[in-house]
C-alpha cells in the first residue's frame, strides 16, 4: 500500500567490539576487527561461593568484576604480531578474591603451627594491576616488541608507563616506570626497583647537602651553629678598654697625633676619621657598637705603623697634596646687586624656590648664591634684633607718615612730622623723637613702630 524506502543492511564498523554472547544476533558475527580478538569476560566468584550469575536463559550476561581497571582475560585467545606469528599473551593478573583466599590460608597455617611469624600479622594490600595507557607498537592492541629481550639494541626508548592501584582512578596514585619496562614484568619487581632508585637518589641528595654544609667558604656558618675561625669575635668591655689604652700609648710613643691617625686611615683604607672620633675612642666616649666597628681599622693601622717606617712620609705627602687642591673662592657681590637684594629682602625675607629662581635670573646670578645670601641676611637681622617683614605681617616700613600722640586728658598737642623726615621743635617738656632722614619708598627704612606718642601730659 505504501512504498517504503529500503535501508542499507546494518553492519559493524572496525571500531566496535562484538558481545561474547551471540544470542542477540542469532549467531551472526558480522564484520569485526581485522585482528582475531574476541574478549570473553570471565565471571567473578563471590565470597559466598556462588558464581555471581543471576539471569535466565542463554542470554544471561556474565557478572563483571567491580574493578573498572581490571585486565582482560586472554584465555583461549591467540595474539599475533605484525608478521602474523602467534605470540604468548601476558599472564592474567591475580584478582582480589584470589588474594583474599591466599591470605586466609596463610593465617590458618600460622594458627595451626602455633608459631608467630616475625613479619607483621597484617599483610600488605594486594599487588596493583598493570595499566598501560600508551600502546607498545603501531597496532591498536598490545603486541610484544621483538627487540624487548635485548634492551641494548633498542634505539628508540618506549614511553613511560604508569602503575595504577587496583580499583582507583588513573590520576589517584601513579608510579612512573622505566621506558623499557615490559608489561610481562611482575609488579613486585617494578615496585622494588622504584623503591631502590628512590632511596639511592635520596641518599645522594642528603650527601650533597651535608657536603655543602661542611664546606662553606669565606668564614660562613658551619653545622651546629659554630662560627668559623675567620669570623672575628666581639670583644668584651675590658678588652676594649685595654686596647684603647695600648693604642694611645703606642701612638704617642711613635709620634703620631690623633689627626694623623684619622688621616692615615683614610689614606690606607679609604675611610677617613676626624680627630674628634679618635679622641673619643681613646677616652671610651663612643658607643660600644661604634667602637667595635672602628677597632679593626685601628688594629690594621697599628700593624702598618710598626712595620712601615715610611708611613709618616706618606701621610705628610698626602696632606700637602690635599692642601694644594683648589678651594672654592669666596663669592663677592657688587654693591648694586646688594642693594637690589636688600629691596627684595624688605618685601619678603623668606622667598620661595620659584621666587629665588626669578631673582637669580634678573640679577644673572646662581640660585645657590641667592639662597645663601637670604639665609645670611636673616641671621644678621636676628643678631641685630631687627624685626623682619614677616614679623610685621608683610607690611613695609614707611617713615614718612604722620605720627600723633593719643589724647591724654583734656590737653593734647599733636606733633606732625614733615615729609622730609625732620621733626618740629618740641614744646614744653615733651621728649624728642629722632626719625631717619630717608624719604618714602627709599632703601633701608628704619623699623619704627606705628603711632608712637609724641607728646606728654602738660600740667
Swiss-Prot record:
Keyword annotations: Activator, Developmental protein, Differentiation, DNA-binding, Homeobox, Nucleus, Transcription, Transcription regulation
GO (cellular component) term, any one: nucleus
The entry's DNA-binding region: 326-385
Subcellular location: Nucleus
Biological processes, Gene Ontology terms: cell differentiation; gastrulation; negative regulation of activin receptor signaling pathway; negative regulation of BMP signaling pathway; negative regulation of DNA-templated transcription; negative regulation of epidermal cell differentiation; positive regulation of DNA-templated transcription; regulation of neurogenesis
MF terms in GO: DNA-binding transcription factor activity, RNA polymerase II-specific; DNA-binding transcription factor binding; sequence-specific DNA binding; SMAD binding; transcription cis-regulatory region binding
Region spans: Disordered: 78-131, 216-238
Residue span(s) of domain POU-specific: 232-306
Biased composition (Basic and acidic residues): 99-112
Phosphoprotein listed as a keyword: no
Domain of life the protein comes from: Eukaryota
Composition bias type Acidic residues, residue spans: 229-238
Family in the record: Belongs to the POU transcription factor family. Class-5 subfamily.
Matches recorded under PANTHER family: POU DOMAIN, POU DOMAIN, CLASS 5, TRANSCRIPTION FACTOR 1.1
Subunit structure: Interacts with components of the transcription complex that assembles on the vent2-B gene, including vent2 (via C-terminus), smad1 and smad4. Forms a repression complex on the promoters of the gsc and mix2 genes via interactions with the nodal/activin signaling pathway transducers foxh1/fast1, gtf2ird1/wbscr11 and smad2. Forms a repression complex on the promoters of the nodal/nr1 and siamois genes with the maternal factors tcf7l1/tcf3 and vegt.
Described purpose of this protein according to its UniProt entry: Transcription factor that binds to the octamer motif (5'-ATTTGCAT-3'). Activates transcription when directly bound to the octamer DNA sequence, but can form repression complexes with other proteins at the promoter site to inhibit transcription. Binds to the promoter of the vent2-B gene to activate transcription when in the presence of other BMP signaling factors also bound to the promoter. Inhibits the competence of ectodermal cells to respond to BMP during embryogenesis thereby inhibiting epidermal differentiation and promoting neural induction.
Record's protein name: POU domain, class 5, transcription factor 1.1
Amino acid at each position: 500500500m505504501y512504498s517504503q524506502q529500503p535501508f542499507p543492511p546494518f553492519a559493524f564498523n572496525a571500531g566496535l567490539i562484538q558481545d561474547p554472547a551471540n544470542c542477540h544476533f542469532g549467531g551472526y558475527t558480522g564484520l569485526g576487527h581485522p585482528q582475531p580478538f574476541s574478549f570473553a569476560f570471565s565471571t567473578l566468584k563471590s565470597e559466598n561461593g556462588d558464581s555471581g550469575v543471576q539471569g535466565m536463559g542463554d542470554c544471561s550476561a556474565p557478572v563483571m568484576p567491580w574493578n573498572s581497571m581490571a585486565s582482560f582475560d586472554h584465555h583461549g585467545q591467540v595474539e599475533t604480531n605484525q608478521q602474523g606469528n602467534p605470540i604468548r599473551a601476558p599472564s592474567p593478573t591475580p584478582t582480589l578474591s584470589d588474594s583474599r583466599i591466599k591470605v586466609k590460608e596463610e593465617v590458618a597455617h600460622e594458627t595451626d603451627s602455633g608459631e608467630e611469624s616475625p613479619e607483621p600479622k597484617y599483610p600488605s594490600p594486594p599487588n596493583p594491576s598493570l595499566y598501560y595507557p600508551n600502546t607498545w607498537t603501531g597496532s591498536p592492541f598490545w603486541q610484544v616488541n621483538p627487540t624487548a629481550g635485548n634492551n641494548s639494541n633498542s634505539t628508540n626508548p618506549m614511553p613511560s608507563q604508569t602503575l595504577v592501584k587496583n580499583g582507583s582512578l588513573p590520576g589517584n596514585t601513579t608510579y612512573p616506570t622505566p621506558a623499557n619496562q615490559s608489561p610481562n614484568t611482575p609488579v613486585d619487581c617494578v615496585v622494588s626497583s622504584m623503591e631502590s632508585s628512590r632511596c639511592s637518589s635520596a641518599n645522594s641528595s642528603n650527601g650533597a647537602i651535608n657536603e655543602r654544609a661542611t664546606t662553606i667558604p669565606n668564614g660562613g656558618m658551619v653545622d651546629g651553629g659554630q662560627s668559623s675561625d675567620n669570623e672575628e669575635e666581639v670583644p668584651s668591655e675590658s678588652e676594649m678598654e685595654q686596647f684603647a689604652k695600648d693604642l694611645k700609648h703606642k701612638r704617642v710613643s711613635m709620634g703620631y697625633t690623633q689627626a694623623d691617625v684619622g688621616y692615615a686611615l683614610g689614606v690606607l683604607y679609604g675611610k677617613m676619621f676626624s680627630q674628634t672620633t679618635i679622641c673619643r675612642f681613646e677616652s671610651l666616649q663612643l658607643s660600644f657598637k661604634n667602637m667595635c666597628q672602628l677597632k679593626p681599622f685601628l688594629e690594621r693601622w697599628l700593624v702598618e705603623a710598626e712595620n712601615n717606617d715610611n708611613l709618616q712620609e706618606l701621610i705628610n705627602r698626602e696632606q700637602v697634596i690635599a692642601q694644594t687642591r683648589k678651594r672654592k673662592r669666596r663669592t663677592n657681590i657688587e654693591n648694586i646687586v646688594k642693594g637690589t637684594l636688600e629691596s627684595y629682602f624688605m618685601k619678603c625675607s623668606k622667598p620661595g624656590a620659584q621666587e629665588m629662581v626669578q631673582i637669580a635670573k634678573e640679577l644673572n646670578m646662581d640660585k645657590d648664591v641667592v639662597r645663601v645670601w637670604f639665609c645670611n641676611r636673616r641671621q644678621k637681622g636676628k643678631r641685630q634684633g631687627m624685626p623682619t617683614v614677616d614679623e610685621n605681617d608683610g607690611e613695609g616700613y614707611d617713615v614718612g607718615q604722620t605720627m600723633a600722640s593719643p589724647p591724654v586728658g583734656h590737653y593734647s598737642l599733636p606733633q606732625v612730622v614733615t615729609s622730609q623726615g625732620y621733626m618740629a621743635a618740641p614744646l614744653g617738656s615733651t621728649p624728642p623723637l629722632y626719625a631717619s632722614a630717608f624719604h618714602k619708598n627709599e632703601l633701608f627704612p628704619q623699623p619704627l613702630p606705628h603711632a608712637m606718642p609724641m607728646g606728654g601730659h602738660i600740667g
